[in-house]
UniProtKB/Swiss-Prot annotation:
Subunit structure: Part of the 30S ribosomal subunit. Interacts with proteins S7 and S18. Binds to IF-3.
Keyword RNA-binding among record annotations: yes
Pfam families documented for this protein: Ribosomal_S11
Organism: Ralstonia nicotianae (strain ATCC BAA-1114 / GMI1000)
PROSITE patterns documented for this protein: RIBOSOMAL_S11
GO molecular function: rRNA binding; structural constituent of ribosome
Primary role: Located on the platform of the 30S subunit, it bridges several disparate RNA helices of the 16S rRNA. Forms part of the Shine-Dalgarno cleft in the 70S ribosome.
One BP term from GO: translation
InterPro entries: Ribosomal_uS11 (IPR001971), Ribosomal_uS11_bac-type (IPR019981), Ribosomal_uS11_CS (IPR018102), Ribosomal_uS11_sf (IPR036967)
Keywords annotated in UniProt: Ribonucleoprotein, Ribosomal protein, RNA-binding, rRNA-binding
Name of the protein described by the UniProt record: Small ribosomal subunit protein uS11
GO CC annotation: ribonucleoprotein complex; ribosome
Higher taxonomy: Bacteria, Pseudomonadati, Pseudomonadota, Betaproteobacteria, Burkholderiales
HAMAP family per the UniProt record, alphabetical: Ribosomal_uS11
NCBIfam families (UniProt xref): PRK05309.1 (NF003698), uS11_bact (TIGR03632)
Length: 133
């Protein structure tokens, strides 16, 4: 029993409020999901949210609205930590790219830089077969 109480105390102690004014929002927009992580300048995560974690399942996870809800959730937690200015780094071709940035902007967080960091191969590995829809 002492072990369970100890881990609960450790979890409660981790939720320390940090006063960080500037941060980086990493938006990973894939075709299936959108993941938003807000970090400080050193890369330590302050908050994160996913479309699937907001209650969207299946094909609804990949919608712009799901990305917007996830970005609002992560942004609110980051604002509680003191975030006022963000750099946004977008990775991936998914449909939630723009709506996540708009949602962060609508929260009142000042967006300083929007940067696309999508990895582009210089003719590396052979890609998977073409999709037929």
């Amino acid at each position: 029993m002492a072990k369970a109480a100890n881990t609960a105390a450790q979890r409660a102690r981790k939720k320390v409020r940090k006063n960080v004014a500037d941060g980086i929002a990493h938006v990973h927009a894939s075709f299936n999901n959108t993941i938003i992580t807000i970090t400080d300048r050193q890369g330590n995560a302050l908050s994160w949210a996913t479309s699937g974690g907001q209650g969207f399942k299946g094909s609804r996870k990949s919608t712009p609205f799901a990305a917007q809800v996830a970005a609002e959730s992560a942004g609110r937690v980051a604002q509680d930590q003191g975030i006022k200015n963000l750099e946004v780094r977008i990775k991936g071709p998914g449909p939630g790219r723009e709506s996540a940035v708009r949602a962060l902007n609508n929260l009142g967080i000042k967006i300083q830089v929007i940067e696309d960091v999508t990895p582009v191969p210089h003719n590396g590995c052979r890609p998977p077969k073409r999709r037929r829809i």
